[in-house]
């Protein structure tokens, strides 16, 4: 009963109309009134921000803020995969040959996540990684590796929350939420960067439109905290052993190593 009620409450508060109203408020000058308290509550690191707090005219501008030059460095090892965001490392593990994986007691379908069987088949037997962004984090998304962009597409119409409660009670939020997917071919192997929308605000803005992308290059931004899921082909990477669930990650930090193939 509790699970059903929670899901119903989520459904009633994250449709397009609600998201539209919240987005309009966040983009209005009226929202500037709550910027100081927002920054305090979420403990935003103001020393890293490109501009002073008072220079942000709306909550939207604060959500999508840039960082000062040099505040993040991208790992330069040619074999490294880097974190595409500032966030909290949630989980990683194998993708089953059935094109599914388990996280937080839920089974996720790669077919559902990517929209069809053909896309999902590439990642059977591969590896997934999940990174959660809170409202306090830097919200811009960068590429974890270099390669050629093979496809960009959007799926889903609503968004369950992706915090602990949402992951427990939501209806498979990582594969059902509004999400924007970019697939990259890197030296003949594929990676999917799945950008998952958060509760209320469905907006994921794409910034990168070229056919190629470089490791660390800016690709998109969230207009609120959310989650990214990385999918890699079989035998493509080895996750850094020291990574632990709940660990804070910074953009550009090494999270995996490309495996050499003879």
Swiss-Prot record:
It is found in: Cell membrane. Its EC number is 4.1.1.65. Binds 1 pyruvoyl group covalently per subunit. Its main location: membrane. Is synthesized initially as an inactive proenzyme. Formation of the active enzyme involves a self-maturation process in which the active site pyruvoyl group is generated from an internal serine residue via an autocatalytic post-translational modification. Two non-identical subunits are generated from the proenzyme in this reaction, and the pyruvate is formed at the N-terminus of the alpha chain, which is derived from the carboxyl end of the proenzyme. It is an enzyme of class 4 (lyase). It catalyses: a 1,2-diacyl-sn-glycero-3-phospho-L-serine + H(+) = a 1,2-diacyl-sn-glycero-3-phosphoethanolamine + CO2. Belongs to the phosphatidylserine decarboxylase family. PSD-B subfamily. Prokaryotic type I sub-subfamily. Catalyzes the formation of phosphatidylethanolamine (PtdEtn) from phosphatidylserine (PtdSer). This is Phosphatidylserine decarboxylase proenzyme.
């Amino acid at each position: 009963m509790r699970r059903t009620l929670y899901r119903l409450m989520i459904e009633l508060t994250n449709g397009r109309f609600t998201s539209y109203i919240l987005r309009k408020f966040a983009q209005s000058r009226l929202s500037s009134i709550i910027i100081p308290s927002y920054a305090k509550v979420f403990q935003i690191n103001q020393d890293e921000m490109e501009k002073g707090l008072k220079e942000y005219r709306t909550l939207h501008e604060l959500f999508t803020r840039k960082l000062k030059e040099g505040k993040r460095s991208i790992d330069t090892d040619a074999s490294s995969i880097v974190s595409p965001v500032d966030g909290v490392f949630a989980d990683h593990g194998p993708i089953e040959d059935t094109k599914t994986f388990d996280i937080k007691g839920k089974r996720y379908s790669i077919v559902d996540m990517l929209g069809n069987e053909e896309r999902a088949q590439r990642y059977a037997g591969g590896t997934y990684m999940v990174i959660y962004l809170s409202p306090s984090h830097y919200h811009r998304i960068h590429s974890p590796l270099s390669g050629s962009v093979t496809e960009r597409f959007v799926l889903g119409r609503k968004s369950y929350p992706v915090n602990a409660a949402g992951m427990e009670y939501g209806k498979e939020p990582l594969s059902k939420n509004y999400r924007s997917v970019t697939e990259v071919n890197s030296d003949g192997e594929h990676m999917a960067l799945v950008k998952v929308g958060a509760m209320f605000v469905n907006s994921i803005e794409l910034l990168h439109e070229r056919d190629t992308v470089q490791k660390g290059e800016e690709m998109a931004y969230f207009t609120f905290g959310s989650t990214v899921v990385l999918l890699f082909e079989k035998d493509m990477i080895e996750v850094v052993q020291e990574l632990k669930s709940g660990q804070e990650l910074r953009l550009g930090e090494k999270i995996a190593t490309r495996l050499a193939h003879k």
